[in-house]
Regions:
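Conserved, well-folded catalytic cores of nucleic-acid-processing
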Residues: 50-51, 87-91, 134-138, 180
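Gly/Thr-rich phosphate-binding beta-strand-loop-beta motif of the actin/hexokinase/Hsp70
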Residues: 15-63, 96-103
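Switch/connector loops and helix/strand junctions flanking conserved nucleotide-binding motifs
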Residues: 54, 70-72, 107-111
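N-terminal phosphate-binding loop and adjacent alpha-helix
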Residues: 59-89
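Active-site neighborhood for divalent-cation/phosphate handling
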Residues: 97, 101-180
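Residue-identity detector for glycine
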Residues: 6-8
Length: 180
C-alpha cells in the first residue's frame, strides 16, 4: 500500500496508479520511500529513475526494540513509528509518500478469471463480488487489491486477474506506524 507520510494522510487503494511496467517509480512522480519492517529493524530506501536505470537517493536502517514486531506482526505501533521517523531523518529524505508491504504470510493471492470486456469500474465491482468465493474472512474485514495480468491462455474473452487480500488489521497497523 502507499500512504502519504505525515498528518492527514490517505492510503491509496491502488499501487498500479503509481506505476508503469516497472512499478513504483514512474517518470515525473513524487518521490516514494520503500519501508521494510522486520522483527529487528526498519529499513528505508528511496530510489529515483535515471534514464532506464535506478539510483539510490536515500537509505537508512534503524533498529527496533525487542518485541516491537513479533512473527511479522506489529505489536508496538509507536515504537515502529518512531523507528520509521528516525530512519527518515537519518536518510535525509524529503519524500511525502511511503510504500510498505504486508508480510507474505498475511496475504492471500489468487488468480481469478474475469470477462475481458469489463471496464475498470465494472471490473472492480465484479472482483469485489467474486472475492467472497476466494477469501476465508468476512469481506468487510479485509483490504483487497487486484491487477489484470493479461488474457487467459486459450480464451481471449477472459482475462486473468491477480486478487490480493489481507486482513484490514495488518494494513492498518502499518498505516498507523507510517502516520506517526
Amino acid at each position: 500500500f502507499v500512504i502519504n507520510v505525515g498528518r492527514g494522510s490517505t492510503c491509496l487503494s491502488r499501487l498500479s496508479e503509481w506505476g508503469d511496467t516497472v512499478g513504483l517509480i514512474p517518470k515525473g512522480q513524487s518521490p516514494l520511500i520503500g519501508v521494510d519492517i522486520s522483527s529487528t529493524a526498519v529499513k528505508l530506501l528511496q530510489l529515483s529513475r535515471v534514464g532506464n536505470r535506478f539510483r539510490v537517493d536515500h537509505y537508512a536502517v534503524e533498529p527496533l526494540p525487542p518485541n516491537a514486531v513479533v512473527e511479522k506482526n506489529i505489536v508496538e505501533v509507536e515504537a515502529v513509528g518512531e523507528a520509521i521517523r528516525r530512519a527518515v531523518t537519518r536518510a535525509g529524505s524529503k519524500a511525502k509518500y511511503a510504500a510498505a508491504a504486508v508480510a507474505g504470510s498475511a496475504v492471500i493471492t489468487k488468480i481469478i478469471p474475469m470477462p475481458a470486456e469489463l471496464d475498470d469500474n465494472d471490473l472492480e465491482a465484479q472482483v469485489e463480488l467474486e472475492a467472497v468465493n476466494y477469501i476465508p474472512y468476512p469481506i468487510e474485514e479485509v483490504n483487497l487489491d487486484f491487477e489484470v495480468l493479461g488474457p487467459m491462455p486459450g480464451n481471449p474473452e477472459m482475462v486473468q486477474v491477480l486478487l490480493a487480500a489481507s486482513r484490514s488489521e495488518n494494513v492498518e497497523l502499518r498505516e498507523s506506524a507510517l502516520e506517526l
